[in-house]
Each structure stands twice: as structure tokens, then as C-alpha cells.
UniProtKB/Swiss-Prot annotation:
GO annotations of cellular component type: cytosol; endoplasmic reticulum; Golgi apparatus; nucleus; plasma membrane; voltage-gated potassium channel complex
Region (Interaction with KCND2): 243-256
Organism of provenance: Homo sapiens (Human)
Name used for this protein in its record: Calsenilin
Similarity comment: Belongs to the recoverin family.
Subcellular location: Cytoplasm; Cell membrane; Endoplasmic reticulum; Golgi apparatus
Length: 256
């Protein structure tokens, strides 16, 4: 399997990348596009590209329809329930499930496999720590594995969720110990992991203290009562009032 070509990303790669107006990485000839509500939109997610790589051949022929029919005969259990829980159609869920089972015959993705996936798409840096945090965000029940249900529910939020849903998902990602608060230590760990993942191929090259500065700007904006932690209420209110943050939400999809 060949890693997908690198796309333009924010230099810190985060949902809140515009807090300090961090410049974007530049690569000539490649433009970011807003995901469309189609199968191609699903494939913009690097994890989905990996999962669907064996089920989305270039061009079309009679074998495509045969594959779709075989998918219908082997629907995942609870397909109707998943359709109700997500914003994917039955056909999209079937396609996602087929790819998931092709790459993960056990029906599970463990953390080591998830890290290997992410390493392919960020070869210029070290994605290990960020992949660990992201894995925990997808692993909704905390059992150490991502089930198909975990995957599609999270993906539905990230690609087709409301602003409120996406922000709540991001808060859960940043709240590393899941106690309902984001501390400076947690945010610094997230920022360092994102900067490590992006590597040295950012423009301009980032200073060593850039992650800490980003965290300080984050707390100046989010921590209304200055108690040293950010609650979900503070996070949602501050984000939805900030035009830069709202316009940068698409950048989060590029990292995922």
C-alpha cells in the first residue's frame, strides 16, 4: 500500500490552529478542498484511504457492481442502527465495512496498527504520540481496540457532524484523562505531539517554544475564570465566538 500524497495542512495541524495565526505549510500545485457529501469525501480521511484502498479501484467495470452485491449479502450486524447513529447511507456503510474487514479481518484495529497507519501519512515527522491520543478518542469504550462501530460514529462526526458535535469531539481529544477538563499539561502534550508529527517540513520553521506559546494563547482565550483549566462550556462558548477558530475547523479534518 502506498501512502497518500501529502496535502496542505496547518503547521500545527490542530483544530485551533488559528489561535496564533500560525502560517500554513506550502506545497505548490496542491490545494485543500472542502469534503463533499460523496464516497470521495470519505476517502479524504487518511484512515479511510487506508481502509478503502482495496475497494476503490480506479475506473469502473462490471466487477464493481458485483462487489457491491457481495457487500449486501454480508452486511455488518446492526447496519440500520448504524445508519440511524451516523450520517452515512447504507451503501457508504457497506463500503466502509468491506474495506475495514479486508484490512482488519478480526474486525478490530489495535493501537499498534493505528500508529503504523498514521506513520505512513506523516513520514516527515513522528506521529506516534498524536496517533495514541487520536486512537483513544476513537476508542469510545476504552477497551484498547477500535471496532467498526467506533470508527464510523467518530468519522461521521468529523466529516458530517454539526459544529457543536465536532467541537465536543475535539474537546474529548484534548481532554487526555477524560475528567471533563483540559489542563495546560494536557494541551501542551497535544501540541507537542502535533508539532512532532508535522516534523521540520513547516514553513516557516517553528521555534522550540512554539507549542508552549500556543498553549498560553489557548488558555488566554478559553479559560474565562482563570482557574487553570478549560471546561467543555468554556471551550464551546469561546470557539463558537471566534471566527478564526470556526474557519479553521476544516484543517482538523486534514489531520484526521
Amino acid at each position: 500500500m502506498q501512502p497518500a500524497k501529502e496535502v496542505t495542512k496547518a503547521s500545527d495541524g490542530s483544530l485551533l490552529g488559528d489561535l496564533g495565526h500560525t502560517p500554513l505549510s506550502k506545497k505548490e500545485g496542491i490545494k485543500w478542498q472542502r469534503p463533499r457529501l460523496s464516497r470521495q469525501a470519505l476517502m479524504r480521511c487518511c484512515l479511510v484511504k487506508w481502509i478503502l484502498s482495496s475497494t476503490a479501484p480506479q475506473g469502473s467495470d462490471s466487477s464493481d457492481s458485483e462487489l457491491e452485491l457481495s457487500t449486501v449479502r454480508h452486511q455488518p450486524e446492526g447496519l440500520d442502527q448504524l445508519q440511524a447513529q451516523t450520517k452515512f447511507t447504507k451503501k457508504e456503510l457497506q463500503s466502509l465495512y468491506r474495506g475495514f474487514k479486508n484490512e482488519c479481518p478480526t474486525g478490530l484495529v489495535d493501537e499498534d496498527t493505528f500508529k503504523l497507519i498514521y506513520a505512513q501519512f506523516f513520514p516527515q515527522g513522528d506521529a506516534t504520540t498524536y496517533a495514541h491520543f487520536l486512537f483513544n478518542a476513537f476508542d469510545a469504550d476504552g477497551n484498547g481496540a477500535i471496532h467498526f462501530e467506533d470508527f464510523v460514529v467518530g468519522l461521521s462526526i468529523l466529516l458530517r457532524g454539526t459544529v457543536h458535535e465536532k467541537l465536543k469531539w475535539a474537546f474529548n481529544l484534548y481532554d487526555i484523562n477524560k475528567d471533563g477538563y483540559i489542563t495546560k499539561e494536557e494541551m501542551l502534550a497535544i501540541m507537542k505531539s502535533i508539532y512532532d508529527m508535522m516534523g521540520r517540513h513547516t514553513y516557516p520553521i517553528l521555534r522550540e517554544d512554539a507549542p508552549a506559546e500556543h498553549v498560553e494563547r489557548f488558555f488566554e482565550k478559553m479559560d474565562r475564570n482563570q482557574d487553570g483549566v478549560v471546561t467543555i462550556e468554556e471551550f464551546l462558548e469561546a470557539c463558537q465566538k471566534d471566527e478564526n477558530i470556526m474557519s479553521s475547523m476544516q484543517l482538523f479534518e486534514n489531520v484526521i
